């Protein structure tokens, strides 16, 4: 059995991950971790996820359950994930990282850790989104410099980073296909007298409202026609199942920084 731990286990995504792990053949939740000051420490992780008792108590200390798992799934916050990364690197534990909002320097730390442990890091673990990334690469290469490119995304009111990691990853894929540097061509929102649009730019627009799980659209607009590639998620379980799939795939893999495209064989 693949022994899986979930950090941030008392949160919305954490509970969904617990359910996904318990549903996956050959996988089992053997550790669940949350903040040390959480009032839920000691509670049964299965009961927190409304699955019934599974005999795995919520821990407030990752080090105390280090012997209980093979791979850690982390969908938390960059500061938390980096601390967990340092621990897992030292302990020789594999990681699945779905946290977004990392700086360029922080991403470099993930790459460094990948020299010692196997890691799957992805902005989005949905199979559908990763298929879209493949399609975006093809679309950008075919349409080339003859279109204007805009990326729109919408998420729930609680999401703290913008644009989403998925939107940025989509922008990276498109920019790379066109030989552009996203940092130089990205335009984040527009207001006032912006002047005519520069076709070399890639625009981003963000919406935050209600309980939207995640909507992403990349628009390729030419004179006379438009192509849109859209993905809409209706449940966090989509991401959770992908993360568990990655955790199973990582079993026996050599140290390295992998992504969901590797897991799905899309590279």
Curated annotation (Swiss-Prot):
The active site is at residues 155, 159. It catalyses: (S)-2,3,4,5-tetrahydrodipicolinate + NAD(+) + H2O = (2S,4S)-4-hydroxy-2,3,4,5-tetrahydrodipicolinate + NADH + H(+); (S)-2,3,4,5-tetrahydrodipicolinate + NADP(+) + H2O = (2S,4S)-4-hydroxy-2,3,4,5-tetrahydrodipicolinate + NADPH + H(+). Its EC number is 1.17.1.8. PROSITE patterns: DAPB. Belongs to the DapB family. GO terms for molecular function: 4-hydroxy-tetrahydrodipicolinate reductase; NAD binding; NADP binding; oxidoreductase activity, acting on CH or CH2 groups, NAD or NADP as acceptor. The lineage of its organism: Bacteria, Pseudomonadati, Pseudomonadota, Gammaproteobacteria, Pseudomonadales. This is 4-hydroxy-tetrahydrodipicolinate reductase. Pathway: Amino-acid biosynthesis; L-lysine biosynthesis via DAP pathway; (S)-tetrahydrodipicolinate from L-aspartate: step 4/4. The keyword Signal does not apply. Its main location: cytoplasm. It is found in: Cytoplasm. It comes from Pseudomonas syringae pv. syringae (strain B728a). InterPro entries: DapB_C (IPR022663), DapB_N (IPR000846), DapB_N_CS (IPR022664), DHDPR_bac (IPR023940), NAD(P)-bd_dom_sf (IPR036291). NAD(+) binds at residues 8-13, 34, 98-100, 122-125. It is an enzyme of class 1 (oxidoreductase). (S)-2,3,4,5-tetrahydrodipicolinate binds at residues 156, 165-166. Catalyzes the conversion of 4-hydroxy-tetrahydrodipicolinate (HTPA) to tetrahydrodipicolinate. NADP(+) binds at residue 35.
């Amino acid at each position: 059995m693949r022994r899986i731990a979930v950090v941030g286990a008392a949160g919305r995504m954490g509970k969904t991950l617990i359910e996904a792990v318990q549903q996956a053949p050959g996988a089992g939740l053997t550790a669940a971790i949350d903040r040390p000051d959480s009032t839920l420490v000691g509670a049964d992780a299965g009961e927190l996820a409304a699955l019934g008792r599974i005999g795995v108590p919520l821990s407030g200390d990752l080090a105390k359950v280090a012997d209980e798992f093979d791979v850690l799934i982390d969908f938390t916050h960059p500061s938390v994930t980096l601390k967990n990364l340092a621990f897992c690197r030292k302990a020789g534990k594999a990681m699945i990282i779905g946290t977004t909002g990392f700086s360029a320097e922080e991403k470099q730390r993930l790459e460094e850790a990948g020299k010692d442990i196997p890691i799957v890091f992805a902005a989005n673990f949905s199979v559908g989104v990763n298929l879209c990334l493949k399609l975006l690469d093809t679309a950008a290469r075919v349409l080339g410099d003859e279109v204007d490119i805009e990326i729109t995304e919408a998420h729930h009111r609680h999401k703290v980073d913008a644009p989403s990691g998925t939107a940025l990853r989509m922008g990276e894929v498109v920019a790379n296909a066109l030989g552009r540097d996203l940092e130089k061509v990205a335009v984040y929102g527009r207001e006032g007298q912006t002047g005519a649009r520069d076709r070399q730019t890639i625009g981003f627009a963000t919406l935050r409202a209600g309980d939207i799980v995640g909507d992403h659209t990349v628009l390729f607009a030419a004179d006379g026609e438009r192509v849109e590639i859209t993905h809409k998620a209706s449940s966090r379980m989509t991401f959770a199942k992908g993360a568990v799939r990655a955790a199973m795939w990582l079993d026996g893999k050599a140290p390295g920084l992998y992504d969901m495209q590797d897991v799905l064989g899309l590279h």
